[in-house]
């Protein structure tokens, strides 16, 4: 399944605000589609599916990528759900977004793909690159790279930055000091793990 490239307004009307995907919001409370205004109690499967879709669209993943992350998380000691969130939050494109160096994860992914980002002074062009505590994020010493990120930093996608990250706006650098606290992620990871467990 490919990455979604359709109308994001339909997605946020169906799933709610997804800051990683877009800054756009909608004032319409009904879901898209012919029967969007009809109230019906969702099944347990529908609830788990919706939470999975929230996570997938927010982080900009294909179904295949998300399934691989779930399998990796299951091999990590401890809570599978928390391990899944930590894997996703430590993706380079997400770290760039959380630092305010890009307004959305797709914008952060573009920065990485185009070679604007360095990790520990080495240029990294893989958005899914797994960062770790202690990593330093910087911007390539090129006028275009610096200009893009300076502009983005004036209008960050999120109002607050998680405690495990720090940003130096003057030098356009960021640092990862640890692992994100669970409370910063507005998703129910247990429902997502249950969804894949029941699918076998």
Curated annotation (Swiss-Prot):
Described purpose of this protein according to its UniProt entry: One of the primary rRNA binding proteins, it binds directly to 16S rRNA where it nucleates assembly of the body of the 30S subunit. With S5 and S12 plays an important role in translational accuracy.
Q: Does the keyword Chloroplast apply?
A: yes
List, in alphabetical order, the Gene Ontology terms for molecular function in this entry. rRNA binding; structural constituent of ribosome
State what protein this is by name. Small ribosomal subunit protein uS4c
Concerning HAMAP family, the annotation shows:
Ribosomal_uS4_B (MF_01306_B)
Task: Note the InterPro entries from the entry.
Answer: Ribosomal_uS4, Ribosomal_uS4_bac-type, Ribosomal_uS4_CS, Ribosomal_uS4_N, S4_RNA-bd, S4_RNA-bd_sf
Superkingdom of the source? Eukaryota
Gene3D superfamilies the UniProt entry points to: Ribosomal Protein S4 Delta 41, Chain A, domain 1, RNA-binding S4 domain
Species classification: Eukaryota, Cryptophyceae, Pyrenomonadales, Geminigeraceae, Guillardia
Q: How does it assemble?
A: Part of the 30S ribosomal subunit. Contacts protein S5. The interaction surface between S4 and S5 is involved in control of translational fidelity.
Q: Which PROSITE patterns match?
A: RIBOSOMAL_S4, S4
| Residue ranges of every copy of the S4 RNA-binding domain listed in the record | 90-152
Compartment(s): Plastid, Chloroplast
| SMART domains given in the database record | Ribosomal_S4, S4
| Cellular component terms per the entry's GO annotation | chloroplast; small ribosomal subunit
**One Pfam family per UniProt:** S4
Q: Where is this region: Disordered?
A: 20-42
Compositionally biased intervals (Polar residues):
23-37
Q: Which UniProt keywords apply?
A: Chloroplast, Plastid, Ribonucleoprotein, Ribosomal protein, RNA-binding, rRNA-binding
Q: In its UniProt record, which GO terms are filed under biological process?
A: ribosomal small subunit biogenesis; translation
Q: Which family does it belong to?
A: Belongs to the universal ribosomal protein uS4 family.
- Supply the SUPFAM superfamilies for this chain: Alpha-L RNA-binding motif
On whether Disulfide bond is a keyword of this UniProt record, the answer is: no
């Amino acid at each position: 399944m490919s990455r979604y490239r359709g109308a994001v307004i339909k997605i946020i009307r169906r799933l709610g605000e997804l800051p990683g995907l877009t800054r756009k919001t909608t004032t319409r409370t009904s879901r898209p589609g012919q029967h969007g205004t009809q109230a019906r109690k969702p099944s347990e499967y529908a609830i788990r599916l919706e939470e999975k879709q929230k996570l997938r669209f927010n982080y900009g993943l294909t179904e295949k990528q998300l399934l691989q992350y779930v399998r990796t998380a299951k091999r990590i000691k401890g809570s599978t759900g928390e391990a899944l969130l930590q894997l996703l939050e430590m993706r380079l494109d997400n770290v760039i977004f959380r630092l305010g160096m890009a307004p959305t994860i797709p914008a952060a992914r573009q920065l990485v793909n185009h070679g604007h980002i360095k990790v520990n002074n080495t240029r990294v062009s893989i958005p899914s690159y797994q960062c770790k505590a202690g990593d330093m994020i910087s911007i390539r010493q090129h006028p275009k790279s610096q200009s893009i990120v300076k502009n983005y930093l004036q209008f960050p996608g999120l109002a607050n930055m998680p405690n495990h990250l720090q940003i130096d706006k003057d030098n356009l650098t960021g640092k990862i000091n640890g692992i994100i606290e669970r409370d910063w992620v507005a998703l129910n990871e247990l429902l997502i793990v249950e969804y894949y467990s029941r699918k076998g």
